[in-house]
């Protein structure tokens, strides 16, 4: 739990503030409906758009008594994206947890702001049918169970029509722009697109759905890249040192130019419904592809089998709002231990929507050329396989003998060759 460093005992509320119409109206609306002064909290997790200073000034102009803004890009990349990378996190085998891994970080800063400014309630802008309401509120409760959480959309009937009328009535300094037909959430790890005509799963996505990726049907010349990892973390690209944030940003640019990382699926939401989702995650998909191949080289067979199961469960837990849970923390410990030998280089060709591994090398690889080769330098004693097969096949032979004894042996067709 974060330590409290309260600077005020006023009755305050902390709002997760994006700078858009919804949360700008929510500042005055929450004040009017709850009687609490509002502290606006904004994080930069690589979503682009307006500067934090612009967002801060808008929050204050809309009635916030304080504005807490944080450039959290490196924190997000180092502590959240890299955990997802080490876990090869793909919910339902496809989705790299673009939104799911940002919510615990945002929640942590919401709680920190609540402690700093003396708030007893945290507000978010989630609807009552999405995953994020659960992620925010479970994360907040995991950090500080004494804080309350509300949603103006879910709990206070703040609809779009009410927002516009409220903004006009109160002369809020908001310029309403043309509303996108989609609901979009984005950060440096990727971009999520939903609603609008996409809610009919038969409708194909149009080119205006995409922003992080170019059309893979018309790619530029293929792009060869070498990524060096140290204990599961990318540290160099084409020989140049990179931080985790820089690695993600560069692969977003290069893989995105090739149309890599476009995802279209029907997804099982935590709240029990299925939803149609589009995602763009060029950097995440390319980095996970490279990381998985390096693990193929460096993890022992049984360890690797177990880790694949753990990776799947980790993605499910994080998707299901369990980032801070004891179960996830235990899985983190296992995953981190597996990464101590996951160091080396992966060469990939990026082209036409695909990231294809073409080379791998590692000083800690378990691939032994002398054991694997079929040439004269082979050091594998093939005669050893005779005894291995006898022992390995013993349970099957004993069971087969029992089946034959009781008339249940496997039938072999006779005279099958004419």
From Swiss-Prot:
Q: Which residues bind L-citrulline?
A: 95, 131, 135, 183, 267, 279
Q: Which family does it belong to?
A: Belongs to the argininosuccinate synthase family. Type 1 subfamily.
> What's a single GO BP term from this record?
argininosuccinate metabolic process
Q: What is the lineage of its organism?
A: Bacteria, Bacillati, Actinomycetota, Actinomycetes, Bifidobacteriales
MF terms in GO: argininosuccinate synthase activity; ATP binding
The record ties this protein, via PROSITE patterns, to: ARGININOSUCCIN_SYN_1, ARGININOSUCCIN_SYN_2
Origin species, per record, is Bifidobacterium adolescentis (strain ATCC 15703 / DSM 20083 / NCTC 11814 / E194a)
Which compartments is it annotated to reside in? Answer: Cytoplasm
Q: Output this protein's name.
A: Argininosuccinate synthase
């Amino acid at each position: 739990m974060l330590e409290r460093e309260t600077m005020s005992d006023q009755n305050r509320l902390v709002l997760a503030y994006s700078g858009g119409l919804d949360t700008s109206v929510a500042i005055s609306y929450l004040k009017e409906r709850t009687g609490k002064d509002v502290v606006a909290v904004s994080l930069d997790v690589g979503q682009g758009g307006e500067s934090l200073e612009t967002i801060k000034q808008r929050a204050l102009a809309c009635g916030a008594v304080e504005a807490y803004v944080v450039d959290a890009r490196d924190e997000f990349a180092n502590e959240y994206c890299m955990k997802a990378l080490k876990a090869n996190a793909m919910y339902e085998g496809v989705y790299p947890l673009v939104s799911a891994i940002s919510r615990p970080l945002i929640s942590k800063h919401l709680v920190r702001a609540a402690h700093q400014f003396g708030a007893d309630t945290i507000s978010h802008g989630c609807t009552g049918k999405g995953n994020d309401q659960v992620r925010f509120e479970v994360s907040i409760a995991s950090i500080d169970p004494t804080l309350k959480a509300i949603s103006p959309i879910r709990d206070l009937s703040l609809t779009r029509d009410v927002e516009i009328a409220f903004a006009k009535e109160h002369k809020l300094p908001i310029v309403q722009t043309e509303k996108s037909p989609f609901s979009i959430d984005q950060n440096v790890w990727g971009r999520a697109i939903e609603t609008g005509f996409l809610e009919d799963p038969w409708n194909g996505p149009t080119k205006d759905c995409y922003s992080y990726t170019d059309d893979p049907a018309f790619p530029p010349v293929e792009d060869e890249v070498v990524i060096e990892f140290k204990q599961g973390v990318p540290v160099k690209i084409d020989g140049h040192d990179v931080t985790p944030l820089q690695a993600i940003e560069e692969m977003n640019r290069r893989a995105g130019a090739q149309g890599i990382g476009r995802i279209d699926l029907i997804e099982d939401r935590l709240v029990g419904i299925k939803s149609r989702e589009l995602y763009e995650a060029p950097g995440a998909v390319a980095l996970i592809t490279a990381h998985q191949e390096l693990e193929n080289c460096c993890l022992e067979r049984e360890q690797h089998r177990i880790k694949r199961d753990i990776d799947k469960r980790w993605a499910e837990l994080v998707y299901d709002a369990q980032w801070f849970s004891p179960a996830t923390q235990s899985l983190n410990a296992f995953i981190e231990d597996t990464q101590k030998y996951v160091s080396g280089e992966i060469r990939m060709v990026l082209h036409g929507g695909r990231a294809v591994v073409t080379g791998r090398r590692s000083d800690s690889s378990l691939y032994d050329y002398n054991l694997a080769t079929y040439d004269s330098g082979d050091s594998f004693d093939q005669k050893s396989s005779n005894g291995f097969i006898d022992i390995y096949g013993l349970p099957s032979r004993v069971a087969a003998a029992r089946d034959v004894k009781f008339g249940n042996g496997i039938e072999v067709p006779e005279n099958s060759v004419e």
